């Protein structure tokens, strides 16, 4: 393949994730992004739990039951001469490491904010994660068809609380019942609101120029005057869009609209494909691999078991970092030093899978995993380097898990190890007893594990309280000191799902004392895969 063709394909791609607080409208936005990309003919409105119509991107049984996204879905669709890869992250009150790791696989993020509520807790947390790699952020202020907070106040809150400059690209005219549309600052045009629902995208009327008398007729002279006054203020007080600051993660372009009303999503998508970076390179232990490097490389950021109950399979999601995947090509798993021939990689439209002939840097492909692939694995076309920066996080919540039927211990352990390889939860086996302790970043993960053990491994399990406050992975460059620590601290030591030594502390004070007592031992709350 010519370098020119490879560069063209890579330049076309945009890979992003949506981040938001639960109920800010993230799943609806996902639907509408797909609708405007024409990937879905019917955007299934996210209904309450009783409705039979489920959102396209929520496709695991538990997600369908609860009307929430629990796992990361991957969807690819074309949009205005580009190919967009959208990674949908869990949107419920819990989220897992899955969410964090998904953010390592994207080049930009869309932040969705409920304009009636402003910046909320989950958004803060997710923004902290995007900060680790200075990911460019596009902002969508949602739910303009409801009564919202003052738009200037919202911008001010984003700037203060999330420490990022705001550059409004569109500006709302009214809200709630009197929402009339938005003014596009870059195009000097007013786009009038026509409510579209489901898969209806209304033709919109556009009025050129801010002083056009047609504007007063269309929205009413009061709203038109308010708009002109507000825009004077906006132009004086807010930031101009700056591509460089955006790419550095320091400034976010802001769009207003209503995902439910199919309005404003296309303006945001236009901005995203125009300004967001094409696939970026990634760091390895030996330096950066650029996306334009002709050789294939990629890393696994997620493993999903049993995506297809008919197939009983496990799929490893691999972000292609450089080069091109071709059906039947050989790939090397750097961790194992083994070559495998891959002829059945998958692409996804949220649970709809199809076999892939080729894929390029920025794309996400699914690899069938028969227990040999782990999160963080690097695949190359023959080199032995490994990508860095795909973390495991120390869990914050712990429970002991036990069986209703003690004869199923083997199945329980197998299920837990597989689920921990997926990154859904972490499992710890204390050195001093036969307990199995499950650690998670959020409460819902515990429910997910019990439901999946039952459905996929035919194991009935329940939880008990366990006296664990926190966990840390332990390392030392001094083998003797580590052996001594292992001997003396056995009561508090465990092995995780990958057999890594872990310190399990009953209290934070206990952890502090252990750190003081053993200065040669490193206690870390993240572990690179």
UniProtKB/Swiss-Prot annotation:
Protein name as it appears in the record: Peptide chain release factor 3
Entry's family note: Belongs to the TRAFAC class translation factor GTPase superfamily. Classic translation factor GTPase family. PrfC subfamily.
Residues in the signal sequence: none
Annotated tr-type G domain residues: 11-280
Localization annotation: Cytoplasm
Binding-site residues for GTP, renumbered to this chain: 20-27, 88-92, 142-145
Role, per record: Increases the formation of ribosomal termination complexes and stimulates activities of RF-1 and RF-2. It binds guanine nucleotides and has strong preference for UGA stop codons. It may interact directly with the ribosome. The stimulation of RF-1 and RF-2 is significantly reduced by GTP and GDP, but not by GMP.
Gene Ontology cellular component annotations, sorted alphabetically: cytosol
InterPro entries per record: EF-G-like_DII, EFG_III/V, G_TR_CS, P-loop_NTPase, PrfC, RF3_C, RF3_dom_3_sf, RF3_GTP-bd
A Pfam family it matches: RF3_C
Gene Ontology terms describing biological process: regulation of translational termination
Keywords annotated in UniProt: Cytoplasm, GTP-binding, Nucleotide-binding, Protein biosynthesis
GO molecular function, one term: translation release factor activity, codon nonspecific
Organism listed in the record: Alteromonas mediterranea (strain DSM 17117 / CIP 110805 / LMG 28347 / Deep ecotype)
């Amino acid at each position: 393949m010519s370098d020119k063709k490879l560069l063209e394909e890579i330049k076309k791609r945009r890979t992003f994730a949506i981040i938001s607080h639960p109920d800010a409208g993230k799943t609806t936005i996902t639907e509408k992004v797909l609708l405007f990309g024409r990937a879905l003919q019917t955007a299934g409105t996210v209904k309450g739990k009783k409705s039979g119509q489920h959102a396209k991107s929520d496709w695991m049984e538990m997600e369908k039951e609860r009307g929430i996204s629990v796992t990361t879905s991957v969807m690819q669709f074309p949009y205005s001469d580009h190919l967009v890869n959208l990674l949908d992250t869990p949107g419920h009150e819990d989220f897992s490491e899955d969410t964090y790791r998904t953010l390592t696989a994207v080049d930009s993020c869309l932040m969705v904010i409920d304009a009636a509520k402003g910046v909320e807790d989950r958004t803060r947390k997710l923004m902290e994660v995007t900060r680790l790699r200075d990911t460019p952020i596009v902002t969508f202020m949602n739910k303009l068809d409801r009564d919202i907070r003052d738009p200037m106040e919202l911008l001010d809150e984003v700037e203060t609380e999330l420490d990022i400059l705001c550059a409004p690209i569109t500006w709302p005219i009214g809200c709630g019942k009197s929402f009339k549309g938005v003014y596009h600052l870059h195009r000097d045009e007013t786009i009038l609101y026509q409510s579209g629902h489901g898969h209806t995208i209304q033709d919109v009327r556009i009025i050129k120029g801010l002083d056009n008398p047609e504007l007063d007729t269309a929205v009413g002279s009061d709203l038109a005057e308010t708009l002109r006054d507000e825009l004077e203020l906006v132009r004086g007080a807010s930031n101009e869009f700056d591509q460089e600051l955006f790419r550095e993660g320091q400034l976010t372009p802001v769009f207003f609209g209503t995902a439910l009303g199919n309005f404003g999503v296309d303006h945001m998508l236009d901005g995203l494909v125009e300004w967001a970076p094409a696939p970026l390179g990634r760091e390895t232990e030996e330096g950066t691999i650029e996306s334009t490097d002709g050789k294939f490389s990629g890393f696994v950021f997620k493993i999903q078991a049993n995506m297809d109950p008919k197939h009983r399979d496990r799929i490893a999601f691999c972000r292609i970092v450089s080069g091109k995947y071709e059906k039947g090509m050989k790939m090397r798993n750097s961790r194992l030093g083994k070559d495998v021939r891959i002829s059945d990689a998958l692409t996804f439209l949220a649970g709809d899978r199809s076999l892939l002939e080729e894929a390029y840097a920025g794309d996400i492909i699914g690899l069938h995993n028969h227990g040999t692939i782990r999160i963080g694995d690097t695949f190359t076309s023959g080199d032995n380097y490994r990508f860095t920066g795909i973390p495991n996080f120390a869990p914050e919540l712990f429970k002991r898990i036990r069986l209703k039927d003690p004869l199923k211990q083997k199945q329980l352990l197998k299920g837990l190890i597989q689920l921990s390889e997926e990154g859904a939860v972490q499992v710890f086996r204390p050195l001093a007893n036969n307990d199995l302790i499950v650690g998670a970043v959020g409460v819902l993960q515990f429910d997910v594990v019990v439901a999946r053990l039952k459905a996929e491994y035919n194991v009935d399990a329940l939880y008990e309280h366990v006296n664990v406050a926190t966990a840390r992975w332990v390392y030392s460059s001094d083998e003797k000191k580590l052996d001594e620590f292992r001997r003396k601290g056995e009561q508090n030591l465990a092995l995780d799902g990958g057999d890594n030594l872990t310190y399990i502390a009953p209290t934070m004070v206990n952890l502090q004392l252990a750190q003081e007592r053993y200065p040669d031992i490193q206690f870390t709350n993240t572990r690179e895969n």
